[in-house]
Amino acid sequence: MARAILWVLLTVMAVSLLLHAGVEGVNFDIENQCPYTVWAAGTPFGGGIELKRGQSWRVNVPGGARGRFWGRTGCSFDGNGRGRCNTGDCGGLLNCQGSGGVPSTLLEYALNQYQNLDFYDISLVDGFNLRMTVVLSNTNCKRIACNSDINSKCPGELKVVDGCRSACAAFNTPAYCCTGSFLDNCPPTGYSQFFKRECPLAYSYAKDDPTSTFTCPGGSDYKIIFCGNGDSQSNSTSTSSGSLYAVE
């Protein structure tokens, strides 16, 4: 929870500067290949939108920004965009304004950082709800994915409707959340090792940086695929321009 709050504070403080900095932005194309509707979300850029199977959504994000994208499931909203979701809920709003509720599979990004590099990762620190693949238009940059059906394998004590909570979200103890006396020395637990086995390229818990954070020269566009198989070019219905991406 503390990690999510810190992330929100950092991104909110940066937004007002970035919007007027004149830095060229990059595109994030979010595509739903799931056999059901997903309500995509992005903060502090994007907000939220309903994506039926095969639909996609383009969000332009300014250079230098930090943020996250994720998918929500089991949602119901009224005409004013108010309601709730089983996973990834944003305080009952279609147009997200906060970090989103647990559990949710996250794509986290920080653009044009040290030596003009982008930093990006798939995070399961808040748990898992959807399979996710991330492909960059710069083909020299690593495609990352979490394509295991974790929900079907989730330990009973972590299982919720449509998702699998992290141990931190489920138990909220220092050992699982890497807080208090575990802030500087927080080894993996049996639960985080479960997530790591299922998705080796994703953050399995808060201190999983060495094997889970990836870099790419700034300026690359991103494609986020919900429920993609990760091994073929996808087809989607979208009003945006042609694909720049090839999934290896």
UniProtKB/Swiss-Prot annotation:
<dbReference type="InterPro" id="IPR001938">
    <property type="entry name" value="Thaumatin"/>
</dbReference>
<keyword id="KW-0325">Glycoprotein</keyword>
<dbReference type="GO" id="GO:0009751">
    <property type="term" value="P:response to salicylic acid"/>
</dbReference>
<feature type="disulfide bond">
    <location>
        <begin position="75"/>
        <end position="85"/>
    </location>
</feature>
<keyword id="KW-0568">Pathogenesis-related protein</keyword>
<feature type="disulfide bond">
    <location>
        <begin position="34"/>
        <end position="227"/>
    </location>
</feature>
<dbReference type="InterPro" id="IPR017949">
    <property type="entry name" value="Thaumatin_CS"/>
</dbReference>
<comment type="function">
    <text>May be involved in disease resistance.</text>
</comment>
<feature type="disulfide bond">
    <location>
        <begin position="141"/>
        <end position="216"/>
    </location>
</feature>
<comment type="similarity">
    <text>Belongs to the thaumatin family.</text>
</comment>
<keyword id="KW-0611">Plant defense</keyword>
<keyword id="KW-0020">Allergen</keyword>
<dbReference type="GO" id="GO:0006952">
    <property type="term" value="P:defense response"/>
</dbReference>
<feature type="disulfide bond">
    <location>
        <begin position="146"/>
        <end position="199"/>
    </location>
</feature>
<feature type="signal peptide">
    <location>
        <begin position="1"/>
        <end position="25"/>
    </location>
</feature>
<dbReference type="GO" id="GO:0009723">
    <property type="term" value="P:response to ethylene"/>
</dbReference>
<feature type="disulfide bond">
    <location>
        <begin position="90"/>
        <end position="96"/>
    </location>
</feature>
<feature type="disulfide bond">
    <location>
        <begin position="168"/>
        <end position="177"/>
    </location>
</feature>
<feature type="disulfide bond">
    <location>
        <begin position="154"/>
        <end position="164"/>
    </location>
</feature>
<dbReference type="GO" id="GO:1904550">
    <property type="term" value="P:response to arachidonate"/>
</dbReference>
<feature type="disulfide bond">
    <location>
        <begin position="178"/>
        <end position="186"/>
    </location>
</feature>
<keyword id="KW-1015">Disulfide bond</keyword>
<dbReference type="GO" id="GO:0009651">
    <property type="term" value="P:response to salt stress"/>
</dbReference>
<dbReference type="InterPro" id="IPR037176">
    <property type="entry name" value="Osmotin/thaumatin-like_sf"/>
</dbReference>
<keyword id="KW-0346">Stress response</keyword>
<dbReference type="Pfam" id="PF00314">
    <property type="entry name" value="Thaumatin"/>
</dbReference>
<protein>
    <recommendedName>
        <fullName>Pathogenesis-related thaumatin-like protein 3.4</fullName>
    </recommendedName>
</protein>
<keyword id="KW-0732">Signal</keyword>
<feature type="glycosylation site" description="N-linked (GlcNAc...) asparagine">
    <location>
        <position position="235"/>
    </location>
</feature>
